[in-house]
Amino acid sequence: MPGPRGAAGGLAPEMRGAGAAGLLALLLLLLLLLLGLGGRVEGGPAGERGAGGGGALARERFKVVFAPVICKRTCLKGQCRDSCQQGSNMTLIGENGHSTDTLTGSGFRVVVCPLPCMNGGQCSSRNQCLCPPDFTGRFCQVPAGGAGGGTGGSGPGLSRTGALSTGALPPLAPEGDSVASKHAIYAVQVIADPPGPGEGPPAQHAAFLVPLGPGQISAEVQAPPPVVNVRVHHPPEASVQVHRIESSNAESAAPSQHLLPHPKPSHPRPPTQKPLGRCFQDTLPKQPCGSNPLPGLTKQEDCCGSIGTAWGQSKCHKCPQLQYTGVQKPGPVRGEVGADCPQGYKRLNSTHCQDINECAMPGVCRHGDCLNNPGSYRCVCPPGHSLGPSRTQCIADKPEEKSLCFRLVSPEHQCQHPLTTRLTRQLCCCSVGKAWGARCQRCPTDGTAAFKEICPAGKGYHILTSHQTLTIQGESDFSLFLHPDGPPKPQQLPESPSQAPPPEDTEEERGVTTDSPVSEERSVQQSHPTATTTPARPYPELISRPSPPTMRWFLPDLPPSRSAVEIAPTQVTETDECRLNQNICGHGECVPGPPDYSCHCNPGYRSHPQHRYCVDVNECEAEPCGPGRGICMNTGGSYNCHCNRGYRLHVGAGGRSCVDLNECAKPHLCGDGGFCINFPGHYKCNCYPGYRLKASRPPVCEDIDECRDPSSCPDGKCENKPGSFKCIACQPGYRSQGGGACRDVNECAEGSPCSPGWCENLPGSFRCTCAQGYAPAPDGRSCLDVDECEAGDVCDNGICSNTPGSFQCQCLSGYHLSRDRSHCEDIDECDFPAACIGGDCINTNGSYRCLCPQGHRLVGGRKCQDIDECSQDPSLCLPHGACKNLQGSYVCVCDEGFTPTQDQHGCEEVEQPHHKKECYLNFDDTVFCDSVLATNVTQQECCCSLGAGWGDHCEIYPCPVYSSAEFHSLCPDGKGYTQDNNIVNYGIPAHRDIDECMLFGSEICKEGKCVNTQPGYECYCKQGFYYDGNLLECVDVDECLDESNCRNGVCENTRGGYRCACTPPAEYSPAQRQCLSPEEMDVDECQDPAACRPGRCVNLPGSYRCECRPPWVPGPSGRDCQLPESPAERAPERRDVCWSQRGEDGMCAGPLAGPALTFDDCCCRQGRGWGAQCRPCPPRGAGSHCPTSQSESNSFWDTSPLLLGKPPRDEDSSEEDSDECRCVSGRCVPRPGGAVCECPGGFQLDASRARCVDIDECRELNQRGLLCKSERCVNTSGSFRCVCKAGFARSRPHGACVPQRRR
């Protein structure tokens, strides 16, 4: 192959130049030789068969030669040197589509595909093209919107499925050419940076469409030139360029040119799986982004290409400026070097831009409907909502403040003529108001910026926030339709050249096809009539074409040919405006209908001439309120009259009007000094003599005060009267000063009338303030001595003697004088220790007395001595006891068979235990007579089980304290057992287990299943309930107290469960216990019957786990059950109660007597359910592991609850079975590898692992009152109990501690 080597050698200097730039250049020469590609179409003209009409490709052959030249740069001490060497050639030959079409070299891979993929498609295999979303067909030549048309033009061609239809597809090369006669040589140049340490991201690939020669044009089909797809796999930091070097055909030979550049990016290329981050819409002055990102994660291209201004993961970055310069006609969207997609689009591949579906981004149009448009989106808010500041969510409208609306503002800035109805500021200022609010806030002047801010639609219109529609148009431009009649209708642009200049590319508009090189990326477009929607502001214009449905945007101040942007067709469905905007007609009914909607208006409204909105009928044009009498306010469907001052509203058959108000009909309107004269719209007051008109609102006639004139009464006091005045002489204590006034006489300055005391002058008189011990005389003009002894409130417990200005006290015996010497206080003799020895000293007035405690007497008046009751009365405690004296009392020591009475002062016969009486649960309860557990029971049955007292008719004998001598005497075998003297075994009385379930019935296990055990009982509750030992019943578990049960929802507790209400469209996931969106819902793997066999599948968030039945154990992954390899690896088998019955409600009954069994042992006997959860046993013979020889045990211990002699102890039998097991207070359980000690409930193993010790629940589990709220916790053997605090007792009906009533 000398030709290719020579071509390669010719390019070596260029590659050395690239190496001088610090890059590694790899030059690959591709010799693409295609031979004998041809075929025919049955039924087609003969003339077309020679051209290779559209039959299937009969055979194909190509040959690729790779001649690499490897260059590298070496730098030392600032001096760099380039060195290149020739690599070994590689040749690839493919024939009939069966050979390998891929070659791999060091750091690169080249794929040659002869299939011509059109419209930006990529050849993914030898017989398939990977098409963009808007095209289909085998060669991506059919638009997705229709079967015909596209880049290849209309007419016969390929169908959507890719099968050949009537027509012709030219071959890739003319038929009959050979390898030597015609070929094209291209150079594929891969430029890469030197690799760094470690392995980088996976390799990228670049695809190129290489033309082999000119195409053919026919009347029916416009075919592209013969092409071949070349794909180069290269490192991600590399760039790929393709150069055409030479061609053996002299006509098509051309100098080396740059073809299909693939520029090297300025930053490392992202991996195939693009990262997700936070999208921000707002920016701060000194920060790249705000503090409130959109919810969820998005890709950078989706964020920055649509609504975002900044994006980032751990750090926020501003979105880069778009370098978009325009995209050409419909079909493949091809951009120049460094070009970006337009706003609202992202790059699909190297040749296509795809619309960004903003509605799929989380957080867009929350609480509203999102409509995706090509390059934008639209938010439609429901009634009562409007778009928020971020333009991405609908927020509820806040009610605006309503206040007075004033029709007039005076020059003195006073508000006048308020309307009777309170209005919002916008509704006031946009209609007839001049000022608004309690502070008389002026409305902005019409035409100013402030007026446009609150009244954007002008005078007479206001914004209905529930109808606001926001539409994104182009480069983040927004239009808010506030027209009262709806959005403006689109206007038809004139098509004359004088009004609309044609674009520069006139050939494409006229549909003329040119044969241009592939590098120019030109396509054919047929012209169609255009209809342009022109917004009111200079936003980019939206041009729509009927076929194909494309959109073109024009930026302001630029010619259409430079700013036009064509976007790939997007399917748009018809929008039901009546459904999306429920109040679109206002006061009317929206009627949908083709092509648009119409409005049927309510009474009082009329349809706008454009029939897009219902407007109110303005009744005020006829001046129904009367000229000059009031202001007519038009309202929705009616009108109101706001009458001026002096007029009133009149409602008659003709409507509302303003009539004159006769103010003079109101009595005393002008006061008592005048009379009223009525005028139209006002009135006037005329005053009588002696009165004058007062300037007030309303004006009245007021009296003239003649006494203000000093000359009215020169020798006396002037007294004003209505309409006149009167002169009066001065009173005693006053002197005339002339001018009609009297002046007070100061008596205190003329002498000392108040000695001993102080004189105080008063108007017309004076007053004496006397010293202590003195009081004013009856006339108040002197001071007299006070006799304090006559008052009787001084010198208590003493004798009083009066002195001038004071008094003296002489105290009686047992009293002493107080500190203020005003009375006598008692002496507390009890403060002296010897006053009352051995008793209680009680102080009295003037003396004291000594009280001795019971059983003592007073000796000598100051000492208490014990009384010996036994010596004084020898008959005490007889005849069944002896008296024993105590300090202050005595007790009886009773004979055998007798017991002391409750007061310890007598002896009574001990009740025999076989007597049957009532058993009481709570002896301390205030209503303990109602706490009867059972009747007709013996004292042993009551006190040896659950009883706290035993007796008849509320005469209760307390049960002996547990572990006391009396308890062991009554219950020798402990709790849960009773003696039966009628049955003996070798002289020893038999012990019978107390069946608490039968004895007390439902009193001890309400809402549950009571199961008798030996000893004691167990209460099994349904799922969702727990057993309350204080209330002796099953109580519903409030799952809502645990917030993790219903995350992101509203939890509602139910009996036995709970309900989690989620906000649609979210649904509740029981596995994750939270409300999740449909995309986040967990897949329940346990729905597969084969999961976890033979065990139970437990679904987990995003996974599941297996609970295996012994002897099966979970596998290493936890998602299957396996048999252990050795007996030592088998899981220990758990033992529990075995049930003989299991109902349809899932409740078990009839526990089998005897010790607890494993699941297999229970189900292999006669069990139907196992465990506290009533796990069902499998059907008989359905894969059972039961041995055939196993049968139900008939031992006496298993079948009868009656135990002769002592019941077998677990620890004794364990020691007999295994010498190596020691288990005190527990039982030995055989396990693989040896027996272990297992403790009963309420016990735990100690450090030696051989003894079961009681768990102190009150100390370990009662933190913060979790066990006994507001009660005292008392630990018991294996359990605990809650006891009410002092002064409280438990209420039987409710089980709560209530204050104890005193009797």
From Swiss-Prot:
Gene3D superfamilies: Laminin, TGF-beta binding (TB) domain. GO terms for molecular function: calcium ion binding; transforming growth factor beta binding. Disulfide bonds join C113-C123, C117-C129, C131-C140, C279-C303, C289-C316, C304-C319, C359-C370, C365-C379, C381-C394, C405-C428, C415-C440, C429-C443, C430-C455, C578-C590, C585-C599, C601-C614, C620-C632, C625-C641, C664-C676, C670-C685, C687-C701, C748-C759, C754-C768, C770-C783, C789-C800, C795-C809, C811-C824, C830-C841, C836-C850, C852-C864, C870-C883, C877-C892, C894-C907, C919-C942, C929-C954, C943-C959, C944-C971, C997-C1010, C1005-C1019, C1021-C1034, C1040-C1051, C1046-C1060, C1062-C1075, C1086-C1097, C1092-C1106, C1108-C1121, C1138-C1162, C1148-C1174, C1163-C1177, C1164-C1186, C1258-C1273, C1268-C1282. It holds the Pfam family hEGF. Residues 529-540 have a biased composition (Low complexity). Residues 1-43 form the signal peptide. Residues 109-141, 355-395, 574-615, 616-659, 660-702, 744-784, 785-825, 826-865, 866-908, 993-1035, 1036-1076, 1082-1122, 1254-1298 form the EGF-like domain. This is Latent-transforming growth factor beta-binding protein 3.
